[in-house]
């Protein structure tokens, strides 16, 4: 049942209020979101296709993404809890942001140089231009870096969102939401631009080695740029996010007798704000509808739209890589729409209500995922509906590819809703309790990572039943989106217009 609520923003009730920050200062304080999102964009656009070139079959690539939900289930709630109670002189959030960003830099270097690491550990000595077989040492190094990247991403995300809610002050969390989404969009634009660029190996030819050819060198260079950008954005956030440290004595008294670690997380889940359980249910269904596309969008472009294969003939590999680059370009267009749309979310919520905006975005995703399935069937229709058969014929030009890119653009607005409204509603509910943004953001993340775990375990085998394509997962995503829209109508709290502009966090 929907709950009507009138909520006010405010601090988290733990320690002194942070000093007032200017709008430009708030903009710079959120810059770390752009740096993290740059690496995340590269991860989403390039790594699922790339791991297949190292010998991991398509059916198992989704299992690799299990690290995300596991990290989110364990790391982010605990980090959120500890950041609420942290008494460091740097403040509550910045120590976790700094630590996580350092680990992100290490992990992306491991990923970028995984082929060279595998070569040093005993992979095939043939030149990568002629060798098409598996490279298991490289795959192991890649997966290690991939998992480390997901754990470090989760270390940063919760505190970064909570920091934004802490600092929003007189500007209101909706303004902070728009700034945060803008940085996310900029990070996405830069990351997807890097991923769609095929000239990195020409600009930095020294990155090519016997184990690392053009596609690998492009990946390596893009991740090295990610390290530089993340380092810069982290430094700016550390300087401009002026937190007030908690008093250790007062914090110790407040925390006396409280459970710690995962026990405190589960205890917190038992005492959620009114309306929060409904938000968790709808969030879970919403993310079930998004994850197949998030995980397989560029692979879908390479296979179903461009009819390529990562482990096929040279012509098929070339077609697959071109599809992946076009998929990254589609994600770039999606991010531009995301950045523009982030400034439309607040007025839409004021006019229609957060619940209506959330429900309508789920309905749009339902239509879009159905369209992805239909477009894929159209592209493969002349080849018996099988990726293997389609890969033996020239990729279809014209309408199919243009329509595929149009779908990326079409999904920009609902993705902006996904990136802001659930977190804003969560922070609004938390504000009514007077604090605990870090913990509640971590609990919300559980409703995101559990669906991802289900998709990671089930999508690959499910698609394998239908010829190693992505159509079945996208069709199921359409069903989940319809369920999310229906659940949103029935369950989501009805938040007043005033509270949308006065409380929230991303």
From Swiss-Prot:
Top-level division of the source organism's lineage: Eukaryota
Gene Ontology molecular function terms on file: sucrose:proton symporter activity
Intervals, Extracellular compartment: 42-54, 116-135, 193-220, 297-327, 377-404, 463-470
GO BP terms in the entry: sucrose metabolic process
Membrane protein topology class: Multi-pass membrane protein
Localization, UniProt: Cell membrane
InterPro entries in the record: MFS_trans_sf (IPR036259)
Pathway: Glycan biosynthesis; sucrose metabolism
GO cellular component, one term: plasma membrane
Membrane spanning stretches: 21-41, 55-75, 95-115, 136-156, 172-192, 221-241, 276-296, 328-348, 356-376, 405-425, 442-462, 471-491
Principal localisation: membrane
SUPFAM superfamilies for this protein: MFS general substrate transporter (SSF103473)
Record keywords: Cell membrane, Membrane, Sugar transport, Symport, Transmembrane, Transmembrane helix, Transport
Stretches in topological domain Cytoplasmic: 1-20, 76-94, 157-171, 242-275, 349-355, 426-441, 492-506
Pfam families registered for this protein in UniProt: MFS_2
Subunit comment: Homodimer.
Family assignment from sequence similarity: Belongs to the glycoside-pentoside-hexuronide (GPH) cation symporter transporter (TC 2.A.2.4) family.
Function of the protein: Responsible for the transport of sucrose into the cell, with the concomitant uptake of protons (symport system). May also transport other glucosides.
Name the UniProt record assigns to this protein: Sucrose transport protein SUT3
Species, as recorded: Oryza sativa subsp. indica (Rice)
